[in-house]
Amino acid sequence: MAEMRLKPEDILKRHEIALTKKEDFRSLYDEAYEFALPQRNLYDGYYDGKVSGSKKMNRVFDATAINSTQRFANRMQSGIFPPHSKWCRLEAGTDIPADRKDEAQAALDVYTEKMFATIKQSNFDIAVGEALLDLCVGTCVMLVQPGDDVTPINFIPVPQFLVAFEEGANGQVDNVYRRMRLKGESIEQQWSDAKIPADLKKKIENKPTEDVELIEATVFDTKRGDYCYHVIHKESKAEIVYRRMKYSPWVVSRYMKVAGEIYGRGPLITALPDIKTLNKVLELVLKNASLAIAGVYTAADDGVLNPNTVTIAPGVIIPVARNGGPQGESLKPLPRSGDFNVSQIIMNDLRMNIKSILLDESLPPDNMSARSATEVIERMKQLSQNLGSAFGRLINETMVPLVEKILQIMDERGIIDLPLRVNGLEIKVTPVSPLAMSQNMDDVQNILQYAQIVQQAGPEGQMMLKTDMLLDLVADKMAIPQSVRNSQAERQMMKEQMAQQAQQVAQEQPELAGQIAEEAIKQGGVM
């Protein structure tokens, strides 16, 4: 089958079109980053102007949004991707035959252990924390690449300012374009198969440490089903790197989407009016405070008082022509108008609104009564309910693609041998993070309540319950690994051994035969 290979000019054109569509979000994202994530703000010319180390909080007067955004990212990470913990489980899908499911699940549990051992060796916990900060604005982007023997996988959180993308079928992100700067001498180190044109090579030899503007493009080949990877030198429009890839290394996640848009809108966009209002109110309060301290004065033009040399400070003597009389004072304070005490009420309301939108509703302080496990679970449940559809989108657009790419890299490096696909039918990714488990525990409680009702209904009720399947379901909901559970074959063997022992006891003590038969009937109904 013929492969699709775009020319460098075509890639640059598509990149410009994608950037033009993204410009519609520039003013919206710019304000969100300026007031809530100023340290990650690249929209105010800091990147284009190549200015590093600049102050980015000149217009920020209140840090409520900054603090709540950080707490939002921390809560999302602890609830969905808890550091140094397992946050998902690989499970056998519906395409796996029932008689092979226990065997497949045991192997997948081993792969799950190896996957999280690999993740712990990487920078995942740091990278996902930074990516979730961008997700609070609306769109986060992460690059998953093979590493070395020490760090098998590298996770790179890319600021979404540098990335433009295109959607394909079913609203999935297919093509990703990234602007990047790299020292000329590092190009061949970054891409060992780079083909540098003569003009660029000469420029690098003269100025090896000067940054080179590059466009990195990952384009989906709709005919072959794989990806084309290009690195283009923007100035000369020369293709430096071209590769074919089985999968895209990009993970692009949107918190929430509006119909007809491809970029996300996060809780910061919702809270932005309150954030800007709070910032302006506090700015006015500070200005009012400075007026209250220093004051504003009127001075008579009498030739004695020189306003340009007057210093308002404790202990200073100001020479004036008069302090009263028919003509009035030479220097007189200008009375202030307005009462800014009401601003405290307004600011408190605005801060509460911002924290509520950003899910920054903390547990009670440590000096209050001890928090029970039930309270923590209920608060996790409330958090998952508040997230709503965003939680499902995070699983589908972030967790599942991440796991898929991690397993593919591990398979390529020989860490595992994975003949199955992560498609939900052969292998499915089941979240076991605290947020997901809070939902599962609701199901477990319902199952156990039903079992209690059945037990109270007597023998007829017990005959309706399949105890072994019930316990399997509870174990799956609680993410109990297959290695500590007996398989169907092992259970059948244990039943046969128990039946033989019961038969032997019945032969030795005939008076117990009736009891054994009754118990066997009861067990048969329950099992």
Question: Where is each model-derived feature located?
Answer:
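Residue-level detector of secondary-structure boundary/capping sites
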Residues: 102, 106, 269, 345, ...
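Extended, helix-rich architectural segments
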Residues: 1-199
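Generic signal for short, ordered secondary-structure residues
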Residues: 94-98, 111, 257, 261, ...
